[in-house]
Amino acid sequence: MCALLSVWSQLLTWFAPNARHHRNATPRILVILLSEMGSVVLAKAMFDTLKAKHPGVDLHVLQLKKNQGVMRLLGFVPEANLHSLDDASLGSLLHDLWHTTRTLRALQLDGVMDCELFSRISALLSYACGARVRIGFTSHTQEGLYRGSFINAPVPYNTYQHISLQFVGLAKVMEAALTWSAAQLNDTTQRPLTRFLMPAIQQSLPQLPVDTAELHAFHARLQVDFASFMGNPKRVLLYVSGGALPIRAWPEDSYIALAKTLIANGCAVGVIGLPEDTPQAQRVLHAVNHPRCIGLTGYTRNLRELLMLFHNAELLVTNDGGPGHFASLTPIDVIAFFGPETGRLYGPISDRATVLESGMACSPCLTAYNHRDSFCDGDNQCLKVITVGEVEKLVLHKLQLT
């Protein structure tokens, strides 16, 4: 489909090079951020750049329906400008593809930014929405990542820059591309389009404001439901699950050993996660077998409550994934394990976060270039070699217990 659409796009370039596109007085831009919730947090600088460069910009966002909670909470765009695709079933996905595409085309967009690295579905959507300027990542001459040639402002993906900076790069290209003529958009001699200096990566994201009354109410609820946990001043949260990619998880036995050490040092431990993570959490609780080690999987009913839970703890120990990024919006300290992917590209943006990586020769092995297909097949030695003793020492230091 990408190849066919590329041929069609090229034919239009040849036979209708000066086709008119509606231009809005204030730019109307669509951002495609389908897949991971944590990426929304890392995209904050990109949204800030778009708003700074285009005052009054009419921003729209397309996401998977299940991932929209973060965008709603952060409020980067108005609720009415959030568009979704429901991938719960093939039928619902096809239904939303049809109706959402029609809605987006009716908006008469000036530009679209595809933040999905080398996803073909997002590339197709960027063309289908009808925007004149189409910005997305390109593999250039690298093989195996083909997704067509209809993205008329392609940006090279840089494996040496944090993804938040690469998102900013897309926004800076949009600033220039919106002023270009059709001939300039098709002028390949000007590429790569990212020949400009990048800002330094943010050291820390600003904390998300939380309503004081709401925070007090959640604190009181915790005190009623988990008195032994809340009665301890040294509260530590563990995210044991690997989420959609279990290969990113530090071993369960290591978490159990860490929890036992924390209990022995007088701390309280809460195991967090989604409701489907409960069986794994119960195994940890059973192994630790102490009243100060509690299960919190499924306890928070939404992302806002998860952030309030972070406000009620001192430290989060987590695998690579959403919780570490969400925690960067709160005062909690974070220790995050990376290995199959690297914190140099995807680490939390927080001066309170510490990334632990073993530095194994094959790490990272999950990349945009191999469609996140690892050699290890579940045997993530890069995480297994991170010792419990090493983590214990860091945790106790952060808790000021050493």
What feature does the model see in each segment?
Residues 1-402:
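Catalytic machinery of carbohydrate-active enzymes
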